């Protein structure tokens, strides 16, 4: 690149920066006036406030309600993203497991004979961890209890040990069903609500800010024109007010369309249906597994009818005959 071309390019860049700075500088008085106006309105010092169309304010209220519902539900259903929500004890167990893992690696490192071997020990993955859920904890404790009974009485059949083993298997299956429920809720409920909050409602919030910002600027321009005491400025102030009035009307129209789109896409009944379906499938699976376990492991035997002693039968007959004679 020649020096002249470089100089020309540099001059152009400097001109663009100068223009940008000039524009920002010109905006400062307007921004200061808008900020002052906003404070005055909040303090009740200004009552001449341009009213937004009723259709628009009703749309704002509807979108606020949708946003409130989404946020309130997510405040609860976000718990499904924490696998141990039904087993808080796992925190202590995780600390103990981490300590054991560190101790094990330190022991292995003391026996390493080379730097590469030590590196392999450090990067080697740890044991596969079971999900820290209540059902998995029940499955584990039932399995351990079954093994203890079998070791204590190796030559005897242990119905309780067998029942514990079956209970362990059932709890593991229920744990898997719960994890499946959590995954469905995360992907088909939480994710959908968050995406709408981030994109559609986020876009609507920006449009609403533009409307209220433009309304402030328009009201400032109206006030400036009304309070003007210099005839030579009246024409320019009127043009400024009319320009801002048109811009205010345009951003309000654009925001109205945006708010309507949010409302039309907010099919929360379908989201609620997905949440209920995930829960129903989990509850049905869990109930079915538990009923099957109870039926197989604790089948109730029919109660035996009490036998009537032979010597009591004639006595009963005699008693009845005595009543007839009476």
UniProtKB/Swiss-Prot annotation:
PTM annotation (Phosphoserine): residues: 2, 319
Gene (name only): GVP36
Region of interest (Disordered), residue spans: 299-326
InterPro entries listed in its UniProt record: AH/BAR_dom_sf (IPR027267), BAR_dom-cont (IPR018859)
Superkingdom in the source lineage: Eukaryota
UniProt-annotated location(s): Golgi apparatus membrane
Biological process per Gene Ontology, one example term: vacuole organization
Biased composition (Basic and acidic residues): 302-314
Pfam family membership, one: BAR_2
Main subcellular location of this protein, as a coarse class: Golgi
Glycyl lysine isopeptide (Lys-Gly) (interchain with G-Cter in ubiquitin) cross-link, renumbered residues: 13, 305, 313
Keyword tags: Acetylation, Golgi apparatus, Isopeptide bond, Membrane, Phosphoprotein, Ubl conjugation
Membrane topology recorded in Swiss-Prot or TrEMBL: Peripheral membrane protein
Protein name: Protein GVP36
N-acetylserine PTM sites in chain numbering: 2
Note: Present with 7721 molecules/cell in log phase SD medium.
One Gene Ontology term, aspect cellular component: cytoplasm
């Amino acid at each position: 690149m020649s020096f002249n071309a470089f100089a020309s390019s540099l001059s152009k860049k400097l001109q663009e920066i100068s223009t940008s700075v000039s524009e920002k500088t010109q905006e400062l008085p307007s921004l200061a006036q808008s900020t002052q106006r906003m404070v005055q309105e909040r303090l009740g010092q200004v009552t001449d406030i341009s009213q937004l169309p009723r259709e628009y304010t009703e749309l704002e209220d509807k979108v606020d309600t949708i946003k409130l519902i989404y946020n309130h539900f997510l405040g609860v259903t976000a718990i499904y993203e924490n696998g141990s929500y039904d087993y808080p004890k796992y925190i202590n167990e995780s600390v103990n497991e981490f300590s054991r893992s560190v101790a094990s690696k330190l022991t292995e490192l003391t026996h390493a004979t080379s730097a590469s071997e030590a590196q392999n020990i450090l990067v080697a993955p740890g044991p596969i961890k079971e999900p820290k859920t209540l059902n998995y904890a029940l499955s584990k404790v039932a399995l351990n209890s079954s093994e203890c009974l079998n070791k204590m009485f190796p030559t005897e059949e242990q119905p309780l040990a067998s029942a514990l083993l079956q209970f362990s298997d059932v709890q593991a299956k229920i744990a898997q069903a719960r994890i499946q429920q959590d995954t469905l809720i995360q992907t088909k409920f939480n994710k959908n609500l968050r995406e709408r909050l981030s994109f559609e409602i986020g876009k609507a919030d920006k449009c609403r800010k533009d409307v209220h910002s433009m309304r402030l600027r328009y009201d400032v321009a109206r006030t400036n024109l009304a309070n003007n005491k210099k005839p030579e400025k009246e024409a320019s102030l009127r043009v400024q007010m009319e320009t801002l009035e048109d811009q205010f009307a345009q951003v309000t129209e654009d925001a109205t369309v945006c708010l309507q789109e949010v409302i039309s896409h907010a099919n929360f009944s379908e989201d609620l249906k997905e949440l209920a379906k995930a829960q129903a499938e989990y509850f049905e699976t869990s109930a079915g597994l538990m009923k099957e376990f109870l039926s197989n492991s604790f089948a109730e035997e029919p109660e035996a009818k009490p036998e009537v002693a032979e010597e009591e039968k004639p006595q009963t007959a005699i008693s009845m005959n005595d009543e007839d004679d009476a």
